[in-house]
UniProtKB/Swiss-Prot annotation:
EC number: 4.3.2.1
UniProt-recorded name of the protein: Argininosuccinate lyase
Matches recorded under Gene3D superfamilies: Fumarase/aspartase (C-terminal domain) (1.10.40.30), Fumarase/aspartase (Central domain) (1.20.200.10), Fumarase/aspartase (N-terminal domain) (1.10.275.10)
Entry's Gene Ontology molecular function annotations: argininosuccinate lyase activity
GO cellular component: cytosol
Annotated keywords: Amino-acid biosynthesis, Arginine biosynthesis, Cytoplasm, Lyase
Keyword Cytoplasm among record annotations: yes
Subcellular location(s) per record: Cytoplasm
Top-level class of the enzyme under EC nomenclature: lyase
Cytoplasm as UniProt keyword: yes
Main location: cytoplasm
Pathway the protein takes part in: Amino-acid biosynthesis; L-arginine biosynthesis; L-arginine from L-ornithine and carbamoyl phosphate: step 3/3
Catalysis performed (reactions): 2-(N(omega)-L-arginino)succinate = fumarate + L-arginine
Length: 462
């Protein structure tokens, strides 16, 4: 077939070269955005008198017809037409005649594709924000049910101090809230229109870029035409934000995997989010959590792939930039899927409160309470730390825990120990007493939950 750009050429490209250079297999995902951008462009052309109102109306009707066909998956794309832009333009000309060729007046595929991707990410970032909010609501619900569920808190994967399970869950809530903030902030840079920048230098036609930007609900336009068509930092920022989000939920998945093991038995996954073994009939594997953990590397890879593509590109457009889309599409699909699975997995899991509580009574995670007890009685904390360290060593040799040590033994270590010591050794008491701002104390958790509910829209401010 003849190319829409073929006037300069005397030879046809090899079929395999066309296939290698074509992007229609993946950029057809931008068909909605491409048509919407074209409608705004032709309306601007009519406003500026570059095409007649009748021509614009005919082109607009043709584009709207193609958009409806696209929604019903009735469009047939061809490799010969290379990409979504030329496919749509070819279909438009076939639909309404040669007047369809006026659509591309004052525009290049360079600013066209950049516009498409800005429109695409503007929509998808908001979808991801909404999905994060749904996951946050699940975390709030689980936290409310587990304010007084006591579990070991860990450092170095060693039991450190007793905490509320709700406190642990809410840690991820606030990580996700920062992810939301990053995505929201990125919209300032995504919601800018490159349309009208042309190939690189603008156009001689008297276009109105601000008008087409307004029609597409952009907040502004790129100030430099070279910048508008050359950079993909808005995609890189999206991939970076998505990588951080995936890192957060991957860490949570790692803990869910550990907690669901026989060694912990803190939670049990719903059968809906687990699988079995083809050989071992007893197995219940946390495959969905493992897949999310694995797919995190995939999202990281998409970020580093585009960074590597971009690092040596001179201005303005280069064909290398065709490689900017597949990683973007893949990341959107991966992130949305992982958030959906994560919410369902957390909503349906069973929390084994008894096992968590039992675990925290069979360790030395209350040792800090003993050191704080001595410090509150005036002993320098470093001396208190030394004394409690010796007490722990004594207990490990005897095979007992701090609650099992008789008062006489405590007094041998320090005369400051009194009967009231045993009141602070209880894990429940230890958690309740940690009432500093942001701590695991029950009052602090309830306050944190109120803030969290406001953020996810469950309650309104007075």
């Amino acid at each position: 077939m003849s190319k829409l750009w073929g006037g300069r050429f005397t030879e046809e490209a090899e079929a395999w070269v066309e296939e290698f250079g074509a992007s229609i297999s993946f950029d057809k995902q931008l068909v909605k955005q491409d048509i919407e951008g074209s409608i705004a462009h032709v309306m601007m052309l009519a406003k500026q008198g570059i095409v007649t109102n009748d021509e614009a109306e005919k082109i607009k009707e043709g584009l709207q017809y193609l958009l409806e066909e696209a929604k019903e998956n009735k469009l047939h794309f061809s490799v010969e037409a290379e990409d979504v832009h030329l496919n749509i333009e070819k279909m438009l000309i076939e639909q309404i005649g040669e007047v369809g060729g006026k659509l591309h007046t004052g525009r290049s595929r360079n600013d066209q594709v950049a516009t498409d991707m800005h429109l695409y990410l503007k929509e998808k970032v908001q979808d991801i924000i909404n999905a994060i909010k749904q996951l946050q609501k699940v975390l709030v619900d689980q936290a409310e049910e587990n304010i007084e569920t006591i579990m070991p808190g860990y450092t170095h994967l060693q039991r450190a101090q007793p905490i509320s399970f709700a406190h642990h869950i809410l840690a991820y809530f606030w990580m996700l809230e920062r992810d939301v903030n990053r995505y929201e902030d990125s919209l300032k840079r995504i919601n800018v229109s490159p349309l009208g920048a042309g190939a690189l230098a603008g156009t001689t036609f008297p276009i109105d870029r601000a008008y087409s930007a307004k029609l597409l609900d952009f907040e502004g336009i790129y100030e430099n035409s070279l910048d508008a068509v050359s950079d993909r930092d808005f995609i890189l920022e999206f991939l970076s934000n998505s990588s951080m989000l995936m890192m957060h939920i991957s860490r949570f998945c790692e803990e869910l995997i550990l907690w669901s093991s026989q060694e912990f038995q803190f939670i049990e996954m719903s059968d809906r989010y687990a699988t079995g073994s083809s050989i071992m009939p007893q197995k219940k594997n946390p495959d969905m959590a493992e897949l999310i953990r694995g797919k995190t590397g995939r999202v990281y890879g998409n970020l580093f792939s585009l960074l590597t593509v971009m690092k040596g590109l001179p201005l303005a457009y280069n064909k290398d930039l065709q490689e900017d889309k597949e990683g973007m599409f893949d990341t959107v699909k991966t992130v949305e899927g992982c958030l959906h699975i994560m919410a369902g997995m957390l909503e349906t899991m069973t929390v084994n409160k008894e096992n968590m509580g039992q675990a925290v009574t069979q360790d030395f995670s209350n040792a800090t309470e003993v050191a704080d007890y001595l410090a509150n009685k005036g002993l320098p904390f470093r001396q208190a730390h030394e004394i409690v360290g010796k007490l722990v060593l004594h207990c490990t040799k005897k095979g007992i825990y701090l609650l099992d040590v008789p008062l006489e033994t405590y007094k041998e270590m320090s005369p400051l120990f009194e009967e009231d010591l045993y009141e602070v050794l209880s894990p429940y008491a230890a958690v309740k007493r940690r009432n500093s701002a942001g701590g695991t104390g029950f009052v602090q958790i309830e306050q944190a939950l109120e803030k969290a509910k406001i953020l996810v829209g469950e309650v309104t401010r007075n």
